[in-house]
């Protein structure tokens, strides 16, 4: 049997040709003289059909019956080489199918644990290494891949340089209570929460930089939106205003959505994602509303029949129900800007004339997906940043390199970060972030 293989995703290019596919058996059915195989190879799913008379005619009765019997008894996830003629078939949901003419078993599969029946979440997570083979899980990972590809493409086209920040650090970029600590040859070190502080150094050297890699948050949160290890893209840029930063973030998110539509259309179809709705998010401008305007809206509607969130005063932080209501109210991704300085990071620059608010923005995704981007302008004045750190009782010695950036040619600069898994969850339309990463790390899960 020829081993010049064709990927399932490329099968439509070979209508009327005999091809060979390397695949796994996702499922099988049939009776009597016919057998149906659901095949997958990592690029797509496809159906093959085997007819007993055709095998007898080609190989003779003894060998033909033996091969057909092999097909009928293939177990789930057996790996095979399968050869056949690609034929158009309107009855098939693919529009075509493979008329199987030969088969070779590569690797047998016995007692595969994830059968077509329903399984509980814990069971599926315990078998995550196998669950990834399922139709929907494969589709989610294809969307993840499309979003990562679109990330690199977007920043390359916009003049950014990939800049790698360290995973191990002696300081915290965000909340120091959420750090994973480790021993670094007798000195305390921490797994990175964000590459932002180092990216600011990169922006002072290279103008526009971004990084993409794993970050770690020791949050004891057990929600559908939290992971303890996830992949983050951080971007930093010099000589860009707050409004220009929001424009860039909006263009980036739209590029990610378009990238998924262009590169993973079959995956979106498998997940039954409303592509017209995704296209709406691309076509319409994102809404921008200030924190105080958002609080006013929440207070005005808190007694509405369909609302389900707690009362907030100006100065309170949003919870997930508030974020959901805000984004659903506007119906498109929504920037909430200028939050109170009291619960935002020390490095954020105050709003001119209003030191109680900072030049920052969170992008809230509609359909209940909540925050997907957080960003701000950074305090570029040395004395102001030192005063803020002293006000918060921070140890300046841990941030000397960061303060140096304000001493030697400081400029207006800002940046933002996006958790890729949250973006994947939003674009894919899935319910839980654990499915947006191959092997999720959560509060009570560190394996497989």
Curated annotation (Swiss-Prot):
Any one of the GO CC terms: cytoplasm
GO BP: asparaginyl-tRNA aminoacylation
Enzyme class: ligase
Subcellular location(s) per record: Cytoplasm
Signal sequence interval, chain numbering: none
Reaction(s) the record says it catalyses: tRNA(Asn) + L-asparagine + ATP = L-asparaginyl-tRNA(Asn) + AMP + diphosphate + H(+)
Domain of life from the UniProt record: Bacteria
Stored InterPro entries: Aa-tRNA-synt_II, aa-tRNA-synth_II, aa-tRNA-synth_II/BPL/LPL, Asn-tRNA-ligase, Asp/Asn-tRNA-synth_IIb, NA-bd_OB-fold, NA-bd_OB_tRNA
Keyword list, A-Z: Aminoacyl-tRNA synthetase, ATP-binding, Cytoplasm, Ligase, Nucleotide-binding, Protein biosynthesis
Keyword Manganese: no
Gene3D superfamilies, A to Z: Bira Bifunctional Protein, Domain 2 (3.30.930.10), Nucleic acid-binding proteins (2.40.50.140)
Similarity comment: family membership: Belongs to the class-II aminoacyl-tRNA synthetase family.
Subunit structure: Homodimer.
HAMAP family given in the database record: Asn_tRNA_synth
Name of the molecule in the record: Asparagine--tRNA ligase
Organism: Streptococcus thermophilus (strain ATCC BAA-250 / LMG 18311)
């Amino acid at each position: 049997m020829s081993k010049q293989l064709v990927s399932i995703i490329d099968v439509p290019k070979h209508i009327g040709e005999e091809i060979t596919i390397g695949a796994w058996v996702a499922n099988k059915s049939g009776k009597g003289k016919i057998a149906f195989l659901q095949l997958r190879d990592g690029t797509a799913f496809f159906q093959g059909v085997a007819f007993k008379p055709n095998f007898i005619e080609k190989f003779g009765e003894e060998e033909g019956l033996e091969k057909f019997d092999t097909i009928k008894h293939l177990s789930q996830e057996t790996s095979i080489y399968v050869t056949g003629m690609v034929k158009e078939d309107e009855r098939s949901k693919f529009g075509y199918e493979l008329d199987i003419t030969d088969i070779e078993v590569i690797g047998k599969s016995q007692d595969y644990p994830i059968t077509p029946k329903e399984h509980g979440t814990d069971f599926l997570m315990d078998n995550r290494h196998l669950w990834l083979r399922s139709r929907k899980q494969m589709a989610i990972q294809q969307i993840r891949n499309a979003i990562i590809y679109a990330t690199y493409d977007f920043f390359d086209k916009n003049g950014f340089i990939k800049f790698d920040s360290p995973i191990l650090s002696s300081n915290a970029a965000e909340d120091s209570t959420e750090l994973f600590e480790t021993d670094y040859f007798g000195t305390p070190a921490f797994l990175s929460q964000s590459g932002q502080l180092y990216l600011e150094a990169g922006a002072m050297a290279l103008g526009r930089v971004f990084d993409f890699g794993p970050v770690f948050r020791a949050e004891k949160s057990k929600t559908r939106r939290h992971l303890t290890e996830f992949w983050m893209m951080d971007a930093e840029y010099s000589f860009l205003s707050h409004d220009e930063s929001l424009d860039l973030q909006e263009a980036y998110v739209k590029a990610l959505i378009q990238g998924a539509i262009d590169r993973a259309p079959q995956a979106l179809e498998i997940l039954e994602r409303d592509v017209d709705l995704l296209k709406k998010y691309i076509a319409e401008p994102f809404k921008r509303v200030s924190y105080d305007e958002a609080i006013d809206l929440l207070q005005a509607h808190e007694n509405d029949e369909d609302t389900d969130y707690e009362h907030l005063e100006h100065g309170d932080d949003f919870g997930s129900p508030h974020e959901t209501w805000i984004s659903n109210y506007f119906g498109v991704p929504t920037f909430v800007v200028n939050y109170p300085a009291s619960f935002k990071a020390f490095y954020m620059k105050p709003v001119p004339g209003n030191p109680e608010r900072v030049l920052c923005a969170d992008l809230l995704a509609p359909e209940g997906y909540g925050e997907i981007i957080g960003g701000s302008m950074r305090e570029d004045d040395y004395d102001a940043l030192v005063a803020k750190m002293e006000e918060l009782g921070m140890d300046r010695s841990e941030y000397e390199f960061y303060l140096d950036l304000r001493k030697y040619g400081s400029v207006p600069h800002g940046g933002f970060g996006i958790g890729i898994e949250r973006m994947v969850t939003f674009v894919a339309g899935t319910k839980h972030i654990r499915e947006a990463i191959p092997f999720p790390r959560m509060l009570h899960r560190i394996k497989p």
